Structures are given as C-alpha cells and as structure tokens.
C-alpha cells in the first residue's frame, strides 16, 4: 500500500472520532455559556472571569494534530520502548538518585535510563495545563506510594496542552495553571517545577522534561496525556490516548495482577 493510501486510510479512521470530539466541545461551550449567563443574571461575583470558548480554530487544530500524533506513534504494545531523549528535572521530594550521573536541571538523559532489568517502569506523560492529567496526579502519587517497592515511576513533562497564549481552558478553579507556550528548555523545566510545587510527588518518582523537539511526545503519541509501563525495555502496558482514554485505574490493575499483595506490603 502506498504512502498516500496509508495517509488516506488514517484520515478516514480519524474523522469519526474527531467530529465526536468537536461535538463534545460544542456541548461543553453551550453548558458553560448557559452557566455564565445565569451567573450574570444573578449578578454573581463569579462572572468576573473571562469566558473562553473551547471550540475554536486553534482548538480544532490541536485536536486534529493529537489524533495524527496518536496514529503515527512509534510505540507499540509488546515491542521495544522508544528510548527518547529527555532532560532531568529535580523533584523537591527526591534525593540524588537519578539513573543519570548528571542530576542538575537540564542535564540530558534518556527515558530508558530510568528502567531496571527486573522492575517495571511506569511512565506518566502530561503537563500542568491539562486538567485531566492534573486531576489524576493525587491518584498517581498514591500508586507511587503503594507500589514503589516493586516498580519504578517516571513523570515526563511534555508540551503544554492548553497554554495561556494558545488553546487555553477556562480557569475556573484554584487548581488551574497559567503557563505560556515553552520558548526554550528552561521554560519547560520551569513549568515542570511549577507543577511539582502544587502537586508534590514521592521521592521514588523521578521527573524529566521532554526535549524542545518533542521527541518523547511524538514517539509515544502523547498529545495531551498518556501512561505506559515498560518492562525489560518492552511496552508491557500502553494506555489509551488522553483525555478520554487516560486511565490510571488500568495501571493499578496491571500492578496488582503482576505483583502479589505480600510484595507490595514489604
């Protein structure tokens, strides 16, 4: 099959889910607009914030690109895990136990540097401006605390899902982040630190940031968020595309299935 035929087939596969996502965004905007109007009529102080639509040209472009990223991802279940280039981000809760010899912020390393021969590596991809990702960080922290005796954990900070100067989401809670598009590696590491200041992670969890060429994001088809498990340098578990198929409960089930309760409690 020629390259053009493959591209056409992928486009046809993407179109139904793309349009369903557009419908979701339209419904979301309608609900938020009705809520905003109701607050205006009640003269509530909560209406001081600016109302932002999600169904915009920028939003459509981001959603479409996310499906393309997922469709062309290198990572496959049961196959070799891509050894993407990343940079170290110091975890305030962690000691100096990075797999790389250099542990200063911005020190180059690779994703599989954090994988050991015998223990699975749970890799969690996301950014501060992705609400589904940040909402699940307490659950991810719980996983680290419960399973760190039998598994290793790595958080990979990627390109912002909803930068404040791009496809921004309404800042309707105290847990929302205002982060602009990363202009350089320092910006990305700073955004990761901002996330860690709000959501502390156990010292057993290492933190890295994707390079500015987004090579980890592309290889793993992350787009917004994704989680996977690497075991013996192979993909033992590959989570679905975020936000709707991002599921940490499946990670818990995998760990519980592969390790006895006795091992976890040791």
Swiss-Prot record:
The keyword Aminoacyl-tRNA synthetase does not apply. One of its GO terms (cellular component) is endoplasmic reticulum membrane. It catalyses: 3,3',5-triiodo-L-thyronine + iodide + A + H(+) = L-thyroxine + AH2; 3,3'-diiodo-L-thyronine + iodide + A + H(+) = 3,3',5'-triiodo-L-thyronine + AH2; 3'-iodo-L-thyronine + iodide + A + H(+) = 3',5'-diiodo-L-thyronine + AH2; 3,3'-diiodothyronamine + iodide + A + H(+) = 3,3',5'-triiodothyronamine + AH2. The chain crosses the membrane at residues 10-34. The active site is at 130. GO terms for molecular function: thyroxine 5'-deiodinase activity; thyroxine 5-deiodinase activity; ubiquitin protein ligase binding. It is found in: Endoplasmic reticulum membrane. PROSITE patterns: T4_DEIODINASE. Ubiquitinated by MARCHF6, leading to its degradation by the proteasome. Deubiquitinated by USP20 and USP33. Residues 35-266 are cytoplasmic. It is a single-pass type III membrane protein. InterPro entries: Iodothyronine_deiodinase, Iodothyronine_deiodinase_AS, Thioredoxin-like_sf. It is an enzyme of class 1 (oxidoreductase). GO terms for biological process: brown fat cell differentiation; hormone biosynthetic process; lipid metabolic process; positive regulation of cold-induced thermogenesis; response to lipopolysaccharide; thyroid hormone catabolic process; thyroid hormone generation; thyroid hormone metabolic process. Pfam families: T4_deiodinase. SUPFAM superfamilies: Thioredoxin-like. Induction: In the pineal gland, exhibits night/day variations with a 9-fold increased expression at night. Up-regulation is due to a large degree to the release of norepinephrine from nerve terminals in the pineal gland and cAMP signaling pathway. In BAT, up-regulated in animals exposed to cold. Residues 1-9 are lumenal. Its EC number is 1.21.99.4. Expressed in cerebral cortex, cerebellum, pituitary gland, mostly in anterior pituitary gland, and pineal gland, as well as in brown adipose tissue (BAT). It comes from the Eukaryota. Belongs to the iodothyronine deiodinase family. Plays a crucial role in the metabolism of thyroid hormones (TH) and has specific roles in TH activation and inactivation by deiodination. Catalyzes the deiodination of L-thyroxine (T4) to 3,5,3'-triiodothyronine (T3) and 3',5'-diiodothyronine (3',5'-T2) to 3'-monoiodothyronine (3'-T1) via outer-ring deiodination (ORD). Catalyzes the deiodination of 3,3',5'-triiodothyronine (rT3) to 3,3'-diiodothyronine (3,3'-T2) via ORD. Catalyzes the phenolic ring deiodinations of 3,3',5'-triiodothyronamine and 3',5'- diiodothyronamine. Predominantly monomer. Can form homodimers but homodimerization is not essential for enzyme activity. Interacts with USP20 and USP33. Interacts with MARCHF6. This is Type II iodothyronine deiodinase. It comes from Rattus norvegicus.
């Amino acid at each position: 099959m020629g390259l053009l035929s493959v591209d056409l087939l992928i486009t046809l596969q993407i179109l139904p889910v793309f349009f369903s996502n557009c419908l979701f965004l339209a419904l979301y905007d309608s609900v938020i607009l009705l809520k905003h109007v109701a607050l205006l009529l009640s003269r509530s102080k909560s209406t001081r914030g600016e109302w932002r639509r999600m169904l915009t040209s920028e939003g459509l472009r981001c959603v479409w690109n996310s499906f393309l990223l997922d469709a062309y991802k290198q990572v496959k279940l049961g196959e070799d895990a891509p050894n993407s280039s990343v940079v170290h981000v110091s975890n305030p809760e962690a000691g100096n136990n990075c797999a790389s010899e250099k542990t200063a912020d911005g020190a180059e390393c690779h994703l599989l540097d954090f994988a050991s021969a015998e223990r699975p590596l749970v890799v969690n991809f996301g950014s501060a401006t992705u609400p589904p990702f940040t909402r699940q960080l307490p659950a991810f922290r719980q996983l680290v605390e419960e399973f760190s005796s039998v598994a290793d954990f790595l958080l990979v900070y990627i390109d912002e899902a909803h930068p404040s100067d791009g496809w921004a989401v309404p800042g309707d809670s105290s847990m929302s982040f205002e982060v602009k598009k990363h202009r350089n590696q320092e910006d990305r590491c700073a955004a990761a630190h901002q996330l860690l200041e709000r959501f502390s992670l156990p010292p057993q969890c290492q933190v890295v940031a994707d390079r500015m060429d987004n090579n980890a994001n592309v290889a793993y088809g992350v787009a917004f968020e994704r989680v996977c498990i690497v075991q013996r340098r192979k993909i033992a578990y590959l989570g679905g595309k975020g936000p709707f198929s991002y599921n940490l409960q499946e990670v818990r089930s995998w760990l519980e299935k592969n390790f006895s309760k006795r091992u976890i409690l040791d």
